[in-house]
Amino acid sequence: MKRVDAILLFFLFSLSCQKLSLSNEKVVIATASNFLETLVTLKKDFESNHDIEIEIRSASSGILYAQILRGIKVDIFLSADEERADMIIEKKLARAGDSFIYAVGKLALWFPGSVCQLSTMSRETAKECLIQSKRIGIANEIIAPYGRAAKETLDSLGLPRTDQKLIRAENIGQTFALGSSQNVDAAFVAMSQLKKLKGSPSYWLVESSSHAAINQKAVLLSQKKAHEGAKLFFDYLKSDDAQRRIS
């Protein structure tokens, strides 16, 4: 009987240690700027069901990639494209099996000021509004996938002398801020950012044929020691509940 009690006590002690270990873990997630608000919502939902703390770092995908290469502590990288996530795998910092497309981005051309206020907008209407615009906000296409998609869209529209009008921000979050403060007449932003605005913003939902697909890939970075909390959140991202919130 004493032996059974000892085994039971050992089992309960092991469970409490495991729970303590998980609760002490902090999962560090590096996310592209366009996904920040959605991730904050997912973080709250996850933390309400798990005794695990989530820390979020946000910047353009290019800057986050560079920081990861320099050795910054990151458990999960949520890139706004496939390219940089795949480069992390190529650098042997993550396994190909620990990655998946968590979202497909939608690009929108937003007219926050008085230049163009329309409830519905076609490609041709958006083109005319861009011609009238003196300042156009865009994320830096070198480091930000949404910026690259915006530049491809501008090229597809065939507008002359557009480069002179471009105001480049470091990431899509800063581009949205330019529009919100009306420091630009037009801004290429993520459609997910416009959903939080009150009223009916004037925008054109850019056709996917105007730019390369914005496939956003998540990677679980390899660790010397298995990080169970990070794995739990990574699996949560794949869940139907999380995907409903993302879409």
Which residues does each predicted region cover?
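Sec-dependent signal peptide recognition
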Residues: 2-9
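Exported/periplasmic ABC-transporter solute-binding proteins
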Residues: 17-49, 55-58, 62, 66-70, ...
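Periplasmic-binding protein-like
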Residues: 75-79
